[in-house]
Structures are given as structure tokens and as C-alpha cells.
Amino acid sequence: MWYRIKISREINQQGVKKPITEYYLTDAKNFAYAGLKVIDTIGKNIEVEDILLMKSYKPAINEYKQGNKVYIIKIAEDMTDENGNIKTIKYPMPVFANNDAELYVIVKNFIKQGLNDMRLTTISETKWIFLS
């Protein structure tokens, strides 16, 4: 499962404490492991004011490579229930790419693999920090 985690902490800039908020995206067994991964990465001697699980995501559709940006896409799928009613299910997924052109190729290839009617509804570029 993929987790987006929000960290609130203070940094010391020229003798003045400045509050900052950072977002991390990581793959972990559960939220506890995800939080531990973030704290291990940013350093044990840094005081964290707040750690918050923001959201969990379906698995990413591609592998992270060093320098990639983190994008969140929203996919809509039309499903037919047992009564014959069509329901649209929307879900966000992380995607890693160097630029928009590469992102569109990755998403286009992913949607082609879908067994049901899949559509791309939104793309958001994030400033999240990816933890492997």
C-alpha cells in the first residue's frame, strides 16, 4: 500500500525557527512502517511536531527512478453491478515521470491494459518527496 504522509516540523534558518510542512510518499506494509520510514529518512535528531497519514493509494503504475517527479492521476472505471446499473469508480494512483510527455505515455499505456472502460480524469503534479 502507498501512503502519503504529512510532516510538520521546525527548521532553524539564521537563528530563527521556521515552521515547515513536507509531504512524503512511500510504500510500506502499514502506516506505522510508513511513519518510521519517514522519521528514519529525515533524521532521528529532528523534532517532528506532527505526523499525519493523509491518504493511502493503490500501487503505483510504474517504478520510481532517481530524479522523477511524483504525479497523482485519477482514473475512472465504469463497472456494471449485479442489477445491470453502471457505476463509475474513481481512484487516485501515483505515477513517476521526468516530465509531462513521459507521464502521458505511461498513463496511455496503463489505460490500454484495462479490462473495463477506464478514463483519465485528472493529473496533479506534486512536490512530494518519494521514499523508496
Where are these regions (language model features)?
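A short beta-strand micro-motif
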Residues: 2-10, 71-78
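A short Gly-Trp-Pro
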Residues: 9-13, 64, 82-84, 130-131
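Hydrophobic, ordered structural segments
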Residues: 19-42, 96-100
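The feature represents the first ordered module of a protein
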Residues: 44-47
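A cross-kingdom feature marking solvent-exposed beta-strand/loop segments within repeated
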Residues: 11-26, 86-93, 113-115
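Glycine-rich, aromatic-bearing surface loops/beta-hairpins
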Residues: 114-132
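Short, solvent-exposed interaction modules
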Residues: 49-115
